[in-house]
Amino acid sequence: MYCSGHLIRLAGRLEIKTSGVVVREWIHPEGKAIYGVDEAGRGPLAGPVYAACVVLDSCYVINGLADSKQLSEKRRASLAEQIKQHARAWAIASASVEEIDRLNILQASMLAMRRAVIELMPVSNALILVDGTHVPQLDYEVQAVIRGDSLVAEISAASILAKTARDAEMLRLHEIYPIYGFDRHKGYPTRVHLDAIRLHGITATHRKSFAPCAEKSTV
């Protein structure tokens, strides 16, 4: 049903989609193929928003899956590698800063989620479980799960992949715009970041639709 070695294009690069279920409070519906979806990067003032979709392998348990925000950077990186190696399928997608400013951050997040799900071409009995209260428009059965990144292993895994992919992108952007400190705050509105915006203006990777950036000139 799923094959290892499929290629996923992400921001002009190719990533490998290789072929866990950790049961917590969530009981998986019988006869459904579960696809977990989550996003990363709704709150920052800069950078794209990322999303991931993950199908876990019930024959391989990945220990320690949790909401990515509750994990250390080192632990997230380790789990991300395990997910990529042992999940039945996974995909990562993003929506650009331009799309965020044009659509708004919620709709851009939904767009990134939709792209990640579509990459996997879900089977007919798929159930797409999405963290939070909003779900993307898809031609599949979709269900929102509040605190899903803490309750559903597939969503936890998606949270980890989305977060690590976005953090890697912010480190790349730090090399281009080092004075903003993206390597430390990943684009979030910390005092260091806000001070840098006040001193230097904004960059092409800042979200002009977000209030702290709206009236600043671009460097």
UniProtKB/Swiss-Prot annotation:
Its EC number is 3.1.26.4. Signal peptide: none annotated. Its main location: cytoplasm. Manganese or magnesium. Binds 1 divalent metal ion per monomer in the absence of substrate. May bind a second metal ion after substrate binding. GO terms for molecular function: manganese ion binding; RNA binding; RNA-DNA hybrid ribonuclease activity. Its cofactor is Mn(2+); Mg(2+). It catalyses: Endonucleolytic cleavage to 5'-phosphomonoester. Gene3D superfamilies: Ribonuclease H-like superfamily/Ribonuclease H. Pfam families: RNase_HII. Residues 32-219 form the RNase H type-2 domain. InterPro entries: RNase_HII, RNase_HII/HIII, RNase_HII/HIII_dom, RNaseH-like_sf, RNaseH_sf. NCBIfam families: PRK00015.1-3 (NF000595), PRK00015.1-4 (NF000596). Endonuclease that specifically degrades the RNA of RNA-DNA hybrids. This is Ribonuclease HII. It comes from Nitrosomonas eutropha (strain DSM 101675 / C91 / Nm57). The gene is rnhB.
